[in-house]
Amino acid sequence: MPARKTAGSVGYDIAACLSEDTVIPPGETRMIGSGVAIALDPGYAAFIYARSGLGIKHGVVPANCVGVVDSDYRGEIIVGLKNTSNEQFTVCDGDRVAQMVIAKCEIPELVLSGDLDETPRGGGGFGSTGND
């Protein structure tokens, strides 16, 4: 069962649900089951993020950076883990492999337009706001 470890935690830890240990060789990705499926109300989504300790200490990160669980998805939450280190990494049953944050999401209606309002920033991106 996903769990928050402190009263101030936003993320619920997601643990591996495995029948046997899974070895992730350097540079490779493995799909790790959680044994968890959720039913979110419409207008909510769950986001699957890295656990900082796995990435910083072991170089093991979610393969897709951030996973999105839509409100109409009813399957098991599976975490793709990529080993970016030079050492093999072993995931065991019960290891915390990711964290899940549930958030209310506005779903706007998109409108195709050829005209956009002018702003002081314009089309500047990739560090443009720090250049005076």
Predicted stretch roles:
Residues 1-132:
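DUTPase catalytic domain/fold
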